[in-house]
């Protein structure tokens, strides 16, 4: 009896009809696809995108060259060189992030004791020339200056959970 039933189901293309029924059910529902460049979905304040270096309100860089972010980076994407200033404090002379190596894990942001390195909400960027994938200190500071209001708002929204 089971063999007869399986022959009837295969002759009537029962699996095909079940698939068409499923397709028909979703054919008239609301679409969930987002056309990305034209439409944007809301982002979380914790989104991890392009990196930026922050400054204090008086304009001084926050980075104290402790090199914790360089040590904690699992992909070895961060390179830091530093020197001592006349007042005895250390400051960075070189701060490079290789975006081809970076896995955007956020460990650098978590390990920074002065909240100097942050990951912004910038997710779409491209490179036209070889070597542009390495962000230098000046570029990172410029990104931090440009998006400081958004970075501060995101940090404030995330503060109760830190």
From Swiss-Prot:
Keywords: 4Fe-4S, Cell inner membrane, Cell membrane, Iron, Iron-sulfur, Membrane, Metal-binding, NAD, Quinone, Repeat, Translocase, Ubiquinone
Alphabetical list of InterPro entries matching this protein: 4Fe4S_Fe-S-bd, 4Fe4S_Fe_S_CS, NADH_quinone_OxRdtase_chainI
Top-level enzyme category: translocase
Cellular component GO terms held in the UniProt record: plasma membrane
GO molecular function, one term: 4 iron, 4 sulfur cluster binding
Membrane protein topology class: Peripheral membrane protein
EC number from the UniProt entry: 7.1.1.-
Entry's cofactor comment: Binds 2 [4Fe-4S] clusters per subunit.
One BP annotation, GO: aerobic respiration
Subcellular location field: Cell inner membrane
Major location (coarse): membrane
SUPFAM superfamilies xref list: 4Fe-4S ferredoxins (SSF54862)
List of residues binding [4Fe-4S] cluster 2: 73, 102, 105, 108
4Fe-4S ferredoxin-type domain: residues covered: 53-83, 93-122
Pfam families according to UniProt: Fer4_7
Annotated positions binding [4Fe-4S] cluster 1: 63, 66, 69, 112
Cofactors that this protein relies on: [4Fe-4S] cluster
Reaction catalysed by this enzyme: a quinone + NADH + 5 H(+)(in) = a quinol + NAD(+) + 4 H(+)(out)
PANTHER family: NADH DEHYDROGENASE [UBIQUINONE] IRON-SULFUR PROTEIN 8, MITOCHONDRIAL (PTHR10849:SF20), NADH DEHYDROGENASE UBIQUINONE IRON-SULFUR PROTEIN 8, MITOCHONDRIAL (PTHR10849)
Quaternary state and interactors: NDH-1 is composed of 14 different subunits. Subunits NuoA, H, J, K, L, M, N constitute the membrane sector of the complex.
Function as written in the Swiss-Prot or TrEMBL entry: NDH-1 shuttles electrons from NADH, via FMN and iron-sulfur (Fe-S) centers, to quinones in the respiratory chain. The immediate electron acceptor for the enzyme in this species is believed to be ubiquinone. Couples the redox reaction to proton translocation (for every two electrons transferred, four hydrogen ions are translocated across the cytoplasmic membrane), and thus conserves the redox energy in a proton gradient.
Family, as annotated: Belongs to the complex I 23 kDa subunit family.
HAMAP family: NDH1_NuoI
Protein name: NADH-quinone oxidoreductase subunit I 2
Originating gene: nuoI2
């Amino acid at each position: 009896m089971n063999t007869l039933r399986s022959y009837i189901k295969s002759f009537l293309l029962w699996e095909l009809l079940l698939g068409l029924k499923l397709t028909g059910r979703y054919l008239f529902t609301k679409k969930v696809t987002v056309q990305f460049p034209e439409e944007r979905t809301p982002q979380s304040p914790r989104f991890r995108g392009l990196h930026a270096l922050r400054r204090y309100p008086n304009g001084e860089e926050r980075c104290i060259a402790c090199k914790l972010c360089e040590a904690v980076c699992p992909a070895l994407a961060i390179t830091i060189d530093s020197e001592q200033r006349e007042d005895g404090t250390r400051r960075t002379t070189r701060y490079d992030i290789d975006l081809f190596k970076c896995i955007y894990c956020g460990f650098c942001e978590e390990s920074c004791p002065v909240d100097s390195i942050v990951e912004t909400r910038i997710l779409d960027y491209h490179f036209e020339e070889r070597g542009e994938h390495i962000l230098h200190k000046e570029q990172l500071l410029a990104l931090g200056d440009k998006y400081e209001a958004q970075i501060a708002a995101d940090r404030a929204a995330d503060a109760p959970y830190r």
